[in-house]
Amino acid sequence: RPTTNSNGQPIAATEEGVKNFWKWFGDSKVVDAEGRPLVYYRATDSDRTEFRKSWRGGLIYFAATPEGAERATRAGNGATYPVYLKADNIRGWKGPGVYYGDAEAKGYEDKLVKGGFDAVKVRDEAARYGGTLAVLSPTQIKSAIGNSGEFDPANPSILRQQARGSITLPTDITKAPAIISL
C-alpha cells in the first residue's frame, strides 16, 4: 500500500503510523487513481480536535481543495484543516453527486444509513474547486498533518498529535531574532 497521500506527503511520520492508518482507512474509496488517500479540507473559525455533525442535516462536509473549503465557510480568519476521510460506500461517488439542498433535507441521513452509505458526494458551489464530500461520523475523519499515528477508529479526535515545533527566544530579543522551528 502507498506510504504517501494524494499530495505526495507521507501519510504518517512512522512505519507504525502508516500501518495504523491503513488499519483505520481499510478499503476506503477516498483515494486517487494510484490508490493514495485523497486529502480533503475544512475551514473553520476556531481550533478543532474533532468535527461534529451539521445542525441541519447531520452530515460533516469537506472540500477537495483549500480554496473550496474557504469559499464554503464564513470563517474569514480561521484555520483550514487537511484531513483524510474514510468512506467505504459513497452515494454519488461515480456520478455528479447529490444536490446540497437534498443532502441537508430532514431525514436524509437516515436514508443514507438505510441505503448502506457512509458518505455522500455533494453537488454545490465548491464543484468548481474539486467538489464536496460529506461523511456521517466524526470517526471517519483524521488529520492529514501532525497526526500522532494512532488513527484510532473509535476516537472522534482528528488528531492526537504531539508537540510540533518550538520557539527559541534569544537572551536579548532586541539584538537577535527569535527562531521558530516546525
Annotate the PLM regions:
Residues R1-L182:
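Active-site and NAD+-binding cores of ADP-ribose-processing enzymes
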